[in-house]
Curated annotation (Swiss-Prot):
Membrane-spanning parts: none
UniProt feature, compositional bias: Polar residues: 159-172, 181-192, 227-248
Organism of origin: Homo sapiens
Domain of life: Eukaryota
Protein's UniProt name: Protein AKNAD1
Chain coiled-coil ranges: 372-484
Database matches in InterPro entries: AKNA_Centrosome-Trans_reg, AKNA_dom
Regions of compositional bias (Basic and acidic residues) in chain numbering: 311-323
Positions of region (Disordered): 159-248, 303-325, 510-545, 575-596
Family: Belongs to the AKNA family.
Keywords on record: Coiled coil
Length: 836
C-alpha cells in the first residue's frame, strides 16, 4: 500500500462530544495503559511478527486504542493508585493538578479510557493557548520545558507495549467504523484534553527499562527504515509541544474535578510603551524552543522505533498547520494591533505636524510682520541714540575749549554755540517725529490683531540723553557768559582810603573847574572851596582826573557817610563793582553817541572832558581809577554788541540846592543837562557790591535790590557841625545795588532800582567837600539800553525754553499714560487667551 492510502487508513476522525456527553463514547487511540510487564512483552512479540505487514501496521494504531477494554478492573484500580502516587512525586513542582484518579474504580471503563490519553492528542493538541495567552517568565518556560521533556520521554517509553494489541482489532473495528463515519469533528475535542498526560506517564515507569531493551533488540531493518521517515514529523510535533507557553491546564474540568482556568481573566499584558520588547520576547521564546530540539538520545531512539510515526505524519503536519496558525495569530495579533496603534499615533503626529504649519502659517506671517515692526522701532531708536551721542561729544569738546581757549574769541564761540543749539533743536524734532512714526506703526500692528508690539525707547534712554544734552548746552552758555563778563583782567582791590584823601583828590579836580559855566548860575561860595554849578570841570589832563572820568560810563560811586566820626576817622572802603559795557574785552572802540557827532569846542569843559575820556578808553580798554589810596576795580562784561546807541545824553547830573528841576544846555555842543536827582530812565544790568570796612562796624550789605539811599547832607547827621547846614554841592548819582553775600548773581527779569547818595561839604571845615562830578552819561546810557535789551532777550528765551520744556514733558507724560494703558490692555488680552 502506498503512503497516501496508508495515511488515509491511519487518519481517523472522532466524534465532537460535549464535555458532559455520553460516557459510552470512546476516545480512539487515546489509552495505552498496561500495568504488567508480561502484557507489554506479549504485545511486543506480536508486533514484531506483524511488523512486515504494512496493512497490519496500518491497523495496529486503530486497535491499540481499545486494548484497555480487556484489562481487568482490578488492575486498572491498582494502576490508578500507582499513578496517583508517582504523579504526586513527579509533577507537584510545576503541574498543579489534583489527581482524582482514585475514584476511577467507581466509574465505567469508558470514563477511565477517556481519563488516560495517549501521546497522539498530546502531540497534536494545542492546549489552552487558543483561549488565553498567559504571560510567563523565562524561568517558568525553562521549568516547563524540562518537565515536558521528562513527560515525553516517559510517555514514549511506556507507550510501546501498549501499541501492539492486534487481537483486539476485530472487537472494536465495527464500532470505530461507525464512529469514523458519524463523528468527523472529534479531533478538536481530543485536542482540547491535553491536561490528561500524566496518567500514562506515571503508569509506565515500572516497565520502562525492559521495554527499552526489548525495543532495541527487536528492531528490524524495515521498522528502522520507516521510523526514520517519521522522525522529522515527530520532532516537529515535539517542538510544538515544547515551544513556549502552549501547555496550561484547565480544560479537563468536565471529566476531572480540576479548577477551570478558562474562566479566569487572561493575564496577557502588552504595554504600549514597550512595543520593541515584545518581538524580542518572541525571539527569546523561539530560541528556547530551538533548544528543546536537543532531545535526549533515549527519546530520539524511542521516536525512531515508533511504528505509528508514518501513520500520523501527514495528520500531524495538518494538525501543526492548524495549531500554529491560531497561536501565531494570537501572538501576532496584539503586536500587529500595537503596531497599528503606533502607526496611527505616528500618522496622527504627522498630521498634527502638517496641520500645525498650515494653522500657524498666518500666525508666523503676522509674527514676522510684528518682528519687522519691532526691529524697525529698534533701528529708529538706535539712529536717534547715535545722533544724540555724536552731538553730545561735540558739546563736550566745545565745553572743554571754552575752559582752555582765551576769552577773546567769544564771537566764534557764540556762533558754534548757536550751531549746536540748532542741532539740538533738530534732534528734538526728529525724536518727536520718530516717536509719532512709531506710534503709527504700532497702530498698524494692532490692526493686524497682534498683541506683541515693540516699544520705542522703552527705558527712555534716548529721551534722557537728549535732555542731558540740552542741560549741557545751557551750562556751556552760562560759562560763555561768565567768561565774557570776566574777560577784563582783574586788578587788586584798593587799599583803605580816607575822606581827606578823597577831599584832596576832588579839590584838585575843583581847581580845574571854571568859576562859572555858561548857562549855569553860580551859588554862594565858602572859603577854601568853590561851588560847582553843574558839570565837572577840569583843566589840565591829570592822571587822577582822567581816571576818575573813566569811571563815569561804567560805574557810579555810592557811599554813605552819615557819622561825624567817620569824617575824623579814616574809612576803609573796599568796593567791587561790576558793570555792563558795550565794549568788547579786546579793547574795541565803543559805540558812538550823539556827543561824538557834535564837535565840542574847548570852551565847553564837559564836551572836552568827554572827548578826552573816549580817547583814553579806546587806548586802554579797561578802567582802573586811582584816587589817592581809593582804588576801584572795574570788571567789564560785554553781553552783546548789536545794541543801538542811545541819543540821549546827560543822564547823570549835578544840581544846586535851590535849583533841582532845572536843565541847561552847553552852548557849544548843545548837551542838555537836567538837574533832576532821579533822572536815569534806564536800568543798569550789571551789579556791584561793596563793603564798609569801618572800625567797629561789620560788613553791611544791601538787603534789597531796590534799596534807596535817600539824598541827605552831612548836616542831617547827629554829630554834624553848624557849618554843614549849608550844602555846597549835591551830587545825585544812579547806582545799581544788589544784595550779595560774598558773590554776585544776576537775576534777569527783575528791575533794578536806583540809589542816590548826596555829599555835602562846608568850605569852612576841614571835612572833605564832595563835588558833583558830572560825567557824561551818553556812553553809559547806550550800554544800559543794550544791556536792557539783552536782558529782555535772555528772559524771553528762558521763558520760551521753559514753555517748550513744559510742553515736551506734557507730551511725554501723555505718551507714557497711553503706553501704559496699551500695555495693560495687552496684558488683559493675554490673560483672557490663556484662560480660554
Amino acid at each position: 500500500m502506498d503512503e497516501a492510502d496508508f495515511s488515509e487508513h491511519t487518519t481517523y476522525k472522532q466524534e465532537d462530544l460535549p464535555y458532559d456527553g455520553d460516557l459510552s463514547q470512546i476516545k480512539i487511540g487515546n489509552d495505552y495503559s498496561f500495568t504488567s510487564k508480561k502484557d507489554g512483552l506479549e504485545v511486543l512479540n506480536q508486533i514484531i511478527f506483524i511488523a512486515d505487514d504494512p496493512q497490519e501496521k496500518a491497523m495496529h494504531s486503530e486497535t491499540c486504542g481499545n486494548t484497555a477494554v480487556t484489562i481487568p478492573l482490578g488492575k486498572i484500580t491498582e494502576n490508578a493508585a500507582n499513578k496517583k502516587d508517582e504523579k504526586e512525586k513527579q509533577c507537584t513542582a510545576a503541574l498543579h493538578i489534583p489527581a482524582n484518579e482514585g475514584d476511577a474504580s467507581k466509574s465505567s471503563i469508558s470514563d477511565i479510557l477517556l481519563h488516560h490519553l495517549s501521546k497522539e492528542p498530546f502531540l497534536r493538541g494545542q492546549g489552552i493557548d487558543c483561549e488565553t495567552l498567559p504571560e510567563i517568565s523565562n524561568a517558568d518556560s525553562f521549568e516547563e520545558e524540562a518537565i515536558i521533556k521528562s513527560i515525553i520521554s516517559c510517555y514514549n517509553k511506556n507507550s510501546w507495549p501498549k501499541e501492539q494489541t492486534p487481537e483486539l482489532t476485530d472487537q472494536l473495528n465495527p464500532k470505530r467504523d461507525g464512529e469514523n463515519s458519524n463523528k468527523p469533528g472529534s479531533a478538536t475535542t481530543t485536542e482540547e484534553n491535553t491536561s490528561d498526560l500524566e496518567g500514562p506517564v506515571a503508569a509506565g515507569d515500572s516497565s520502562h527499562q525492559e521495554n527499552v531493551n526489548v525495543l532495541t533488540k527487536t528492531k528490524g531493518p524495515g521498522d528502522k527504515q520507516k521510523s526514520y521517515q517519521g522522525q522529522s514529523p515527530q520532532k516537529q510535533q515535539t517542538e510544538k509541544a515544547n515551544s513556549g507557553n502552549t501547555f496550561k491546564y484547565g480544560q479537563g474540568q468536565v471529566h476531572y474535578q480540576l479548577p477551570d482556568f478558562s474562566k479566569i481573566a487572561p493575564k496577557v499584558k502588552i504595554p504600549k510603551n514597550k512595543i520593541i520588547n515584545k518581538p524580542l520576547a518572541i525571539a527569546k521564546q523561539a530560541s528556547f524552543s530551538s533548544k528543546s530540539r536537543d532531545k535526549p538520545t533515549l527519546v530520539q531512539d524511542s521516536l525512531e522505533t515508533t511504528p505509528e510515526s508514518n501513520c500520523v505524519e501527514k495528520q500531524h503536519q495538518e494538525q501543526k498547520g492548524k495549531i500554529t496558525e491560531p497561536s501565531q495569530q494570537i501572538q501576532m495579533e496584539p503586536i500587529v494591533h500595537i503596531h497599528q496603534e503606533l502607526l496611527t499615533g505616528i500618522e496622527s503626529e504627522a498630521s498634527l505636524s502638517k496641520l500645525s504649519p498650515t494653522s500657524q502659517k498666518g500666525t508666523s506671517s503676522s509674527s514676522s510682520y510684528i518682528f519687522q515692526k519691532i526691529s524697525q522701532g529698534k533701528q529708529m531708536c538706535q539712529k536717534l541714540k547715535e545722533q544724540t551721542d555724536q552731538l553730545k561729544t561735540k558739546v563736550q569738546e566745545f565745553s572743554k575749549r571754552i575752559k582752555q581757549d582765551s576769552p577773546y574769541h567769544l564771537q566764534d564761540k557764540k556762533l558754534v554755540l548757536e550751531k549746536l543749539q540748532g542741532h539740538l533743536e533738530l534732534l528734538e524734532q526728529n525724536f518727536l517725529a520718530t516717536k509719532d512714526k512709531h506710534l503709527t506703526l504700532q497702530q498698524q500692528v494692532h490692526k493686524h490683531e497682534s498683541t506683541i508690539v515693540g516699544d520705542f525707547d522703552p527705558e527712555r534712554k534716548v529721551e534722557g540723553e537728549i535732555f542731558k544734552l540740552e542741560m549741557l548746552l545751557e551750562d556751556v552758555k552760562e560759562k560763555m557768559d561768565e567768561s565774557k563778563y570776566t574777560s577784563a583782567p582783574s586788578l587788586p582791590v584798593s587799599s583803605p582810603v580816607t575822606l581827606d584823601d578823597l577831599a584832596s583828590t576832588f579839590s584838585s579836580l575843583s581847581n580845574e573847574i571854571p568859576k562859572e559855566h555858561p548857562g549855569h548860575p553860580s551859588g554862594p561860595r565858602g572859603s577854601g572851596g568853590s561851588e560847582v554849578t553843574g558839570t565837572p570841570q577840569g583843566g589840565p589832563q591829570e592822571a587822577p582826573n582822567e581816571e576818575l572820568c573813566e569811571l563815569a560810563p561804567q560805574t557810579y560811586l555810592n557811599g554813605h557817610y552819615g557819622d561825624a566820626a567817620a569824617q575824623n576817622k579814616p574809612d576803609q572802603v573796599a568796593m567791587r563793582l561790576s558793570s555792563n559795557s558795550g565794549e568788547d574785552p579786546n579793547g574795541t572802540p565803543r559805540r558812538q553817541d550823539c556827543a561824538e557827532m557834535t564837535a565840542p569846542s574847548p570852551s565847553c569843559a564837559f564836551c572836552r572832558r568827554l572827548l578826552e575820556w573816549k580817547q583814553n578808553v579806546e587806548k586802554k580798554g579797561h578802567g582802573r581809577i586811582n584816587c589817592g589810596r581809593f582804588s576801584i576795580v572795574l570788571h567789564e562784561k560785554a553781553p552783546h554788541s548789536d545794541s543801538t546807541p542811545n541819543s540821549d545824553t546827560g543822564h547823570s547830573f549835578c544840581s544846586d540846592s535851590g535849583t533841582e528841576m532845572q536843565s541847561n544846555k552847553c552852548q557849544d555842543c548843545g548837551t542838555k543837562i537836567p538837574t533832576s536827582r532821579r533822572a536815569c530812565r534806564k536800568e543798569p544790568t550789571k551789579e556791584f557790591h561793596y563793603r564798609y570796612n569801618t572800625p567797629g562796624q561789620n560788613y553791611s550789605n544791601h538787603s534789597k535790590r531796590g534799596a534807596f539811599v535817600q539824598p541827605h547832607s552831612l548836616d542831617e547827621s547827629k554829630n554834624s557841625s553848624p557849618s554843614f547846614l549849608k550844602p555846597k554841592r549835591i551830587c545825585s548819582q544812579r547806582v545799581n545795588s544788589k544784595s550779595f553775600k560774598g558773590e554776585h548773581e544776576p537775576t534777569p527779569g527783575k528791575k533794578k532800582l536806583q540809589a542816590f547818595m548826596t555829599y555835602s561839604s562846608d568850605p569852612a571845615t576841614p571835612s572833605p567837600h564832595f563835588y558833583s562830578c558830572r560825567i557824561s552819561g551818553s556812553k553809559s546810557l547806550c550800554d544800559f539800553d543794550s544791556t536792557e535789551e539783552i536782558k529782555s532777550e535772555i528772559l524771553n528765551s528762558a521763558l520760551d525754553h521753559a514753555l517748550r520744556t513744559a510742553t515736551i514733558l506734557k507730551e511725554t507724560t501723555d505718551q507714557m499714560i497711553k503706553t501704559i494703558a496699551e500695555d495693560l490692555a495687552k496684558a488683559q488680552r493675554w490673560r483672557n487667551r490663556l484662560k480660554y
